[in-house]
Amino acid sequence: MSIVRIAPEINLVMDTESGTVTQERKDSIQYSMEPVFERVDKLDAIADDLVNSLSPSKPLLNTWPGRENTSYIAGIYSNSFYGIIVGLAFSGLLALIIYITRLMGGVV
């Protein structure tokens, strides 16, 4: 917040952000909110990054350009891998059960 003293002898000042002209008072204190706004903007960017981390198609704050769908593609590959492993295990178990039932065909 910057203030321009128009007439120091009669304590007349102007606020440059709003353009208002007023009398300067000794009993009021004015603080600049710019450092607070900078920190709030930084926290807002971090909060947006946290929300974007939940979506695989959104870019993260500290990633290289062009890596928006990396999580999505990695999810497809890992789920495909685990699907193949579970499918092969199920098929092997089914083949083992069929083999054992054929061996025991005359016993039961």
Swiss-Prot record:
Record key words, sorted: Cell membrane, Membrane, Methanogenesis, Methyltransferase, One-carbon metabolism, Transferase, Translocase, Transmembrane, Transmembrane helix
- Pathway the protein contributes to: One-carbon metabolism; methanogenesis from CO(2); methyl-coenzyme M from 5,10-methylene-5,6,7,8-tetrahydromethanopterin: step 2/2
- One Gene Ontology CC term in the entry: plasma membrane
Give any GO molecular function from the UniProt entry.
tetrahydromethanopterin S-methyltransferase activity
Entry's EC annotation = 7.2.1.4
Compartments annotated for it: namely: Cell membrane
Q: How does it sit in the membrane?
A: Single-pass membrane protein
Q: Provide the transmembrane region boundaries.
A: 81-101
Q: Please give the positions of the paired cysteines in each disulfide bond.
A: none
Question: What's the chief localization of this chain?
Answer: membrane
Q: Which reaction does it catalyse?
A: 5-methyl-5,6,7,8-tetrahydromethanopterin + coenzyme M + 2 Na(+)(in) = 5,6,7,8-tetrahydromethanopterin + methyl-coenzyme M + 2 Na(+)(out)
In the record, biological process GO terms are:
methanogenesis, from carbon dioxide; methylation; one-carbon metabolic process
InterPro entries xref list: MtrB_MeTrfase (IPR008690)
Function in brief: Part of a complex that catalyzes the formation of methyl-coenzyme M and tetrahydromethanopterin from coenzyme M and methyl-tetrahydromethanopterin. This is an energy-conserving, sodium-ion translocating step.
What does the record note on quaternary structure? The complex is composed of 8 subunits; MtrA, MtrB, MtrC, MtrD, MtrE, MtrF, MtrG and MtrH.
Which protein family is it in? Belongs to the MtrB family.
Which protein is depicted?
Tetrahydromethanopterin S-methyltransferase subunit B
* Organism from which the protein derives: Methanosarcina mazei (strain ATCC BAA-159 / DSM 3647 / Goe1 / Go1 / JCM 11833 / OCM 88)
